[in-house]
Amino acid sequence: MALLKSKPTSPGKRGEIRVVHHHIYKGKPHAALVEKLKKTGGRNNQGRITVRHIGGGQRQKYRIIDFKRNKDGILGRVERLEYDPNRTALIALISYKDGEKRYIIAPSNLEVGATIQSGADSPISVGNCLPLKNIPVGTTIHCVEMKPGKGAQMLRSAGCSGQLVAKEGVYATLRLRSGEMRKIHVLCRAVIGEVSNSEHNLRALGKAGAKRWRGIRPTVRGVAMNPVDHPHGGGEGRTSGGRHPVSPWGLPTKGYKTRSNKRTDTFIVRGRKKK
């Protein structure tokens, strides 16, 4: 993995920084693990925009990822590492002893030809998946389940990891990168190591078109709109909006908490660190 800064041959190339992976497979994905992916343009079944700033972009296929890691006791070999357009992390194609192939989220330092396995008896090494009760305190983990058997829901993006800091009764305590401390049931599974492609946040797309290739449309400022479109719209000449920043629907937009309390709040021992 390396960061490649482009030569300033054009205004778009001047600011571009790419993450280059020399070791990944350049061919087509494994056909049996690929599904059609339809673009919505941010519209729902009534044709109304429910998510703004989505539309266009390169046509993609969805890679079916094994988040459950439930092939206990069967050794798997890393056949190749691949790029996945649907996520920031790299993925690895695993070929199991029984002939089945599955994609998993590739951890850092996982190499082609390495062997991985799942289950309570698996050794503590990168890429292996175990229940939290079988993982030593202090271990770095990723792809963590929130309910036993449901499949990994936490720590799946590029460079993500958490640390197992305590085990007490039926709950284990995890420290996340955000500073949050959270309790998870000890029967939930996690994968050893940190997610690959940790330099993803250092890339710079360089030009607007690179965003459009990814299906991201422009974000227009509220003060540049008309009064019918946004609370900050209108006015003669350039204005500051005339009020505290709000969303197009009138809700405060700078630091206003929108998350409603849930019964799962009881599992959050300490909240995220304030910036």
Swiss-Prot record:
Gene Ontology MF: a single term: structural constituent of ribosome
HAMAP family xref list: Ribosomal_uL2_B
Lineage: Bacteria, Pseudomonadati, Pseudomonadota, Gammaproteobacteria, Legionellales
Domain of life: Bacteria
SUPFAM superfamilies recorded: Nucleic acid-binding proteins, Translation proteins SH3-like domain
Cysteine pairs bridged by disulfides in the record: none
Function: One of the primary rRNA binding proteins. Required for association of the 30S and 50S subunits to form the 70S ribosome, for tRNA binding and peptide bond formation. It has been suggested to have peptidyltransferase activity; this is somewhat controversial. Makes several contacts with the 16S rRNA in the 70S ribosome.
NCBIfam families for the chain: rplB_bact (TIGR01171)
GO terms (BP aspect): cytoplasmic translation
Family: Belongs to the universal ribosomal protein uL2 family.
Keyword list, A-Z: Ribonucleoprotein, Ribosomal protein, RNA-binding, rRNA-binding
Coiled-coil residues: none
Pfam families the record matches: Ribosomal_L2, Ribosomal_L2_C
Native species: Legionella pneumophila (strain Lens)
Oligomer status and interactors: Part of the 50S ribosomal subunit. Forms a bridge to the 30S subunit in the 70S ribosome.
Region of interest called Disordered, as start-end residue ranges on this chain: 223-260
Record-linked PROSITE patterns: RIBOSOMAL_L2
GO cellular component term, pick one: large ribosomal subunit
Record-given protein name: Large ribosomal subunit protein uL2
